[in-house]
């Protein structure tokens, strides 16, 4: 499986979503924007400010975003870490900046779960890939009333990407530990341990149970079996950050340099034609 470069000179792209009209909207953590790509044209979908990292499309047509706060090098003020909702007209609303008394520090990725709530990771750092910030990460859920709960606190492992498989089991990546974990009976278990140089970020499941995991440093996407074994590598030559399926096409956000700064423009956007069919995401709204 080979990748096709669709766009370049982006900031720090992350969190792609597939829109009903076929457009792909993704976050740009360096420019504070949601960007829209369709048929070769790249536009600004909305301005969130700060560092948007993850996104998921709600059944209400809104895009729900993890907001990491002001990007380094900017003069922004008033942008706080939290969960945002972006309506189709570009209106941005902060839904929550704390859960169950815990201030959100570095919300990273998110997905709707089978219970209708929004599940998300908080890496414990305001900015992506700050593994030197050794504070615990957390996993949270947010419900439609604005309430929520802390699912668990993780050690200094940088919880990152999150996804549900065909059995509606929740998985998340732990970048600093190079592993993917699964929630089993309320506890986190290690589902797959990756080798040196494979730092997992965002991920997407195929309908057959395979997991397509974006791995920075290694320069592409690592494909795992339903049992967690490495099957193959999709080499892009860049730090792959997140991905999403549209049918059998895997759309991947990436960056040549994993540097978060308002002036950095090394991000790229790719498509990969695969032999898989993407698993439909669980619908939800808040």
Model-flagged regions — what are they?
Residues 1-286:
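Sequence-structural signature of mature extracellular/luminal beta-sheet repeat domains
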């Amino acid at each position: 499986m080979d990748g096709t470069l669709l766009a370049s000179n982006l900031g720090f792209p992350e969190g792609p979503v597939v829109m009903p009209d076929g457009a792909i909207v993704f976050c740009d953590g360096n420019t504070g924007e949601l960007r829209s790509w369709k048929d070769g044209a790249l536009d600004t979908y909305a301005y969130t400010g700060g560092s948007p990292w993850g996104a998921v499309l709600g059944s209400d047509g809104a895009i729900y975003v993890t907001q990491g706060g002001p990007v380094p090098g900017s003069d922004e003020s008033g942008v706080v870490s939290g969960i945002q909702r972006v309506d189709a007209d570009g209106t941005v609303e902060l839904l929550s900046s704390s859960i169950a008394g815990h201030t959100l520090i570095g919300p990273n990725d998110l997905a709707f779960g089978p219970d209708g709530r929004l599940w998300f990771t908080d890496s414990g750092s305001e900015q992506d890939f700050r593994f030197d910030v050794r504070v615990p990460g957390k996993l949270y859920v947010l419900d439609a009333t604005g309430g929520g709960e802390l699912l668990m606190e993780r050690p200094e492992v940088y919880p990152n990407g999150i996804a549900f498989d065909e059995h509606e089991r929740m998985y998340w990546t732990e970048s600093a530990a190079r592993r993917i974990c699964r929630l089993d009976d309320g506890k986190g278990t290690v589902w797959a341990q990756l080798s040196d140089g494979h730092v997992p970020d965002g991920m997407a499941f195929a309908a057959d149970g395979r997991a397509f995991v974006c791995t920075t440093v290694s320069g592409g996407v690592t494909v795992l079996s339903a049992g967690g074994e490495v099957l193959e590598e999709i080499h892009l030559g860049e730090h792959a950050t997140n991905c999403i399926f549209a049918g059998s096409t895997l759309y991947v956000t990436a960056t040549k340099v994993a540097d978060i700064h308002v002036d950095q423009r090394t991000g790229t956007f790719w498509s990969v034609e695969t032999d898989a069919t993407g698993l439909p995401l669980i619908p939800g709204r808040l």
